[in-house]
């Protein structure tokens, strides 16, 4: 199989010698589901067979040593953040973000409700295998009188450029590189 050159083009991952974007294969992230085949990781794309979808695409590969692969993170808790009543005072919940990859990443935190939810620190840089403890705070509010159904924290991260200082830069997220996201819904117990 020829060497592939990975590039980002208008939101689609494409590969050399490919006649359609790799996104058509619904292959986006680790554990991606491909036609009748579940992959264990991004490097497994290099083993994909020729002529998927009736020969429309000759190759759909992502090189194993690709610079465009974004490192993975883990969060503790992994699926949601829970705040317990009463809500007359400010609550703080700590979450841990771990860079489980072999690359330095920059991360930024977004919230869907900036009046009620805050995160400290809201952004930063993590070296490989490094972790940071984030304080997620919930300001006092009238529970039951305000809509809380769509509240969530979103962790966004991307690889830092090679040789970059360990200082967060917003422009890392504004270029054409891959930015990953993990949503952590907020649950409010009465």
UniProtKB/Swiss-Prot annotation:
It comes from the Eukaryota. It is found in: Cell projection, Pseudopodium; Cytoplasm, Cytoskeleton. Residues 72-189 form the MSP domain. PROSITE patterns: MSP (PS50202). Keywords: Cell projection, Cytoplasm, Cytoskeleton. The keyword NAD does not apply. GO terms for cellular component: cytoplasm; cytoskeleton; pseudopodium. Sperm. PANTHER family: MAJOR SPERM PROTEIN (PTHR22920), MSP DOMAIN-CONTAINING PROTEIN-RELATED (PTHR22920:SF7). Around 30 MSP isoforms may exist in C.elegans. Central component in molecular interactions underlying sperm crawling. Forms an extensive filament system that extends from sperm villipoda, along the leading edge of the pseudopod. This is Major sperm protein 32. It comes from Caenorhabditis elegans.
